[in-house]
Amino acid sequence: MRNVRVTAAEASRADGVSPMDGVSPVDGVSPAVAGFPAAGASSAAGVSPADASQSGTLQSGTLQSGTRVAWAGGGELMFEARGLVKRYQLGEVEVLALRGVDFLLRSGEFVVLLGPSGSGKSTLLNILGGLDTPSEGFVRFRDHDLSQGDDDLLTHYRRDHVGFVFQFYNLIPSLTARENVQLVTDLAAAPMRPEEALELVGLGARLDHYPSQLSGGEQQRVAIARAIAKRPDVLLCDEPTGALDVRTGIVVLEAIERINRELGTTTAVITHNAAIAAMADRVVQLSDGRVASESRNAVKAAARDIQW
């Protein structure tokens, strides 16, 4: 990597987290803080993220029209959230973003959180990702209570265990695709090579291109590569296709699909686009801060077969 200077605001985007969140991946938190296992060393039950797809947690097979057998369960419980309430105070007005949400997510699962704007999707995802804490209730990541975590614990948790993908890419304009990913891999304990991560999302031939030389879909795939290069336990995606046209959005969904399938990365995607729900193992519908319904897809649609 060439010697490049970046500002503090740019550095805070290196892990896909907006500078508005006040999260910096270069804040000096020790990899052994708060009792979490070392990043990338192993996942629970001794299964590495790279081996997860071979562990029996995922059961898949090729069906006609490119569909795949849905996740069959059996993975460890990665997230348990109970009774989540989130209040925001806007002047004298109290806004309830979540109203008693229960949510479980198991290792290797692909879940779509579906609902209109204001339904609580992003608030729930932010709490799962350690970007926010609930006003009431609790959320556990494995054996760790994130709802009681201090800033050091949550910063370490985000940096070593969670990959974020947002609607906006947050790439550093002065760095190439490879260098944007390497900002994260330089901080992780057992990362992929940047080239490997970019190859996974179909950008092996675009390593040395700058964001301005990439299309919107390609920039989003760089953001996905950056998110998964540190081998996170979970990939959290907030409207990853929201700024893209249908054709480009499908390519981005194929990248997310491949990461879940080949790496066994637990994946949660929030969207207002009901068509995307067809590619999930499980679909959770939110409305007015509550879980309105939950269903499973017996057979998952391939991303390339989705139309909207």
Language-model features and meaning:
Residues 77-286, 291:
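ABC family nucleotide-binding domain
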Residues 1-43, 47-87, 293-308:
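ABC-family P-loop ATPase nucleotide-binding domain
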